[in-house]
């Protein structure tokens, strides 16, 4: 029997700064409730989640401040570009994330927006704790040292 192909993920938006500003301790995948024009705009590859975060709104978890531009072909039926979007998670997952943000000083940040192999828009969420300035500098030093070490090993070998 042939091995299963790895699921394809077409990444639309990537929040690379989140791993710099936060120590990500847990990640999970969530669906996102979108309108038709938002899906069309995402399929065009345009979205920004650099300033986005997830937080509670009533009993749901919402994605705030994520920018999905208007779809150019839809004239008067377009969506609001920075509206709060509902995240589709199980109740137990929502309660866990809300509890962590309220008690322990954690933040839920979106790491990626992508389309899965079934064509559904998904958000990869990270539960992270903010880094101090000295932690960020330490991470940069460690990354530079790893790069230099790899370069030295490559030149010797």
From Swiss-Prot:
Q: Extract the PROSITE patterns matched here.
A: SSRP
Q: Which compartment or compartments is the protein found in?
A: Cytoplasm
Claim: NAD is one of the keywords in the record: no
Q: Does the keyword Cytoplasm apply?
A: yes
Name the UniProt key words of this record, in alphabetical order. Cytoplasm, RNA-binding
Q: What does this protein do?
A: Required for rescue of stalled ribosomes mediated by trans-translation. Binds to transfer-messenger RNA (tmRNA), required for stable association of tmRNA with ribosomes. tmRNA and SmpB together mimic tRNA shape, replacing the anticodon stem-loop with SmpB. tmRNA is encoded by the ssrA gene; the 2 termini fold to resemble tRNA(Ala) and it encodes a 'tag peptide', a short internal open reading frame. During trans-translation Ala-aminoacylated tmRNA acts like a tRNA, entering the A-site of stalled ribosomes, displacing the stalled mRNA.
Q: Which HAMAP family match?
A: SmpB (MF_00023)
- Predominantly, its location class is cytoplasm
Gene name tied to this protein: smpB
**Family in the record:** Belongs to the SmpB family.
In terms of domain of life, where is this protein from? Bacteria
Chain residue ranges for the region called Disordered:
126-157
Per UniProt, the ranges with Basic and acidic residues bias are: 132-157
Alphabetical list of NCBIfam families matching this protein? PRK05422.1, smpB
| One GO-annotated biological process of the protein | trans-translation
Any one GO MF term held by the record is: RNA binding
- Could you tell me what this protein is called? SsrA-binding protein
Q: Which GO terms describe its cellular component?
A: cytosol
